[in-house]
C-alpha cells in the first residue's frame, strides 16, 4: 500500500533535484564529476559496481552515473545554463541517499536547489 501504511518490507528512497547557478567549469569537468559521484557513493554507504560518463560535444554537458548494488546515482549537466540535475536512488536501511545528495550539492555549489523525495518502498498490511 502506498503512503507508508503497514509494515515496510522493501526500503526504497529516492531524492532528486534541480541545481541552478552552478559554476559552468565544474559542470564540464568530467574527472571532477566522476570523483564527486564516487565519493557520494561512499557517503551513501552504497556498494559501487560501476561508473560511467558521456559527454555531449567537446564543450557540452555531461552525464555521469554510478551503478550501485542498491540502485544508482546520476548527475546531468548543462554548463551553458549553469544547470544540473542530480538523482540518488537507493534501497536498504543501511543507505543514506540524502547524505549523498547533499554532498553532491555542496560540490556543485548551486545558487538555488529544488529537491524532491520519493518513498519507493513496499509496505505490507
Curated annotation (Swiss-Prot):
Top-level EC class: lyase
- Which residues are the active-site ones? 71 (schiff-base intermediate with substrate), 76 (proton acceptor), 91 (proton donor)
Subunit and partners: Heterotetramer of two alpha and two beta chains arranged as a dimer of alpha/beta heterodimers.
HAMAP family assigned: AdoMetDC_1 (MF_00464)
Name the chemical reaction catalysed here.
S-adenosyl-L-methionine + H(+) = S-adenosyl 3-(methylsulfanyl)propylamine + CO2
UniProt keywords, alphabetically? Autocatalytic cleavage, Decarboxylase, Lyase, Polyamine biosynthesis, Pyruvate, S-adenosyl-L-methionine, Schiff base, Spermidine biosynthesis, Zymogen
Question: Which pathway does the protein contribute to?
Answer: Amine and polyamine biosynthesis; S-adenosylmethioninamine biosynthesis; S-adenosylmethioninamine from S-adenosyl-L-methionine: step 1/1
Annotated EC: 4.1.1.50
Read off the Pfam families from this record: AdoMet_dc (PF02675)
Q: What protein name applies here?
A: S-adenosylmethionine decarboxylase proenzyme
The entry's family comment says: Belongs to the prokaryotic AdoMetDC family. Type 1 subfamily.
From which source organism is this entry?
A: Pyrobaculum islandicum (strain DSM 4184 / JCM 9189 / GEO3)
InterPro entries listed in its UniProt record = AdoMetDC_C, AdoMetDC_fam_prok, AdoMetDC_N, S-AdoMet_deCO2ase_core, S-AdoMet_deCOase_pro-enz
Q: How is the cofactor bound?
A: Binds 1 pyruvoyl group covalently per subunit.
* Pyruvic acid (Ser) modifications at: 71
Please give the Gene Ontology molecular function terms for this protein.
Answer: adenosylmethionine decarboxylase activity
A GO CC term assigned to this protein in UniProt: cytosol
Q: Which cofactor does it need?
A: pyruvate
BP terms from Gene Ontology: spermidine biosynthetic process
Instruction: Report the gene name.
Output: speH
What's this chain's function? Answer: Catalyzes the decarboxylation of S-adenosylmethionine to S-adenosylmethioninamine (dcAdoMet), the propylamine donor required for the synthesis of the polyamines spermine and spermidine from the diamine putrescine.
Amino acid at each position: 500500500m502506498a503512503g507508508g501504511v503497514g509494515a515496510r518490507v522493501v526500503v526504497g528512497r529516492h531524492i532528486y533535484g534541480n541545481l541552478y547557478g552552478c559554476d559552468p567549469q565544474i559542470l564540464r569537468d568530467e574527472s571532477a564529476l566522476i570523483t564527486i559521484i564516487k565519493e557520494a557513493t561512499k557517503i551513501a554507504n552504497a556498494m559501487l559496481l560501476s561508473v560511467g560518463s558521456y559527454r555531449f560535444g567537446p564543450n557540452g554537458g555531461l552525464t555521469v552515473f554510478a551503478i550501485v548494488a542498491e540502485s544508482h546515482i546520476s548527475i546531468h549537466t548543462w554548463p551553458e545554463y549553469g544547470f544540473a540535475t542530480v538523482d540518488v536512488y537507493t534501497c536498504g536501511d543501511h543507505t543514506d541517499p540524502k547524505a549523498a545528495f547533499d554532498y553532491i550539492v555542496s560540490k556543485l555549489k548551486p545558487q538555488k536547489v529544488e529537491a524532491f523525495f520519493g518513498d519507493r518502498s513496499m509496505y505490507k498490511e
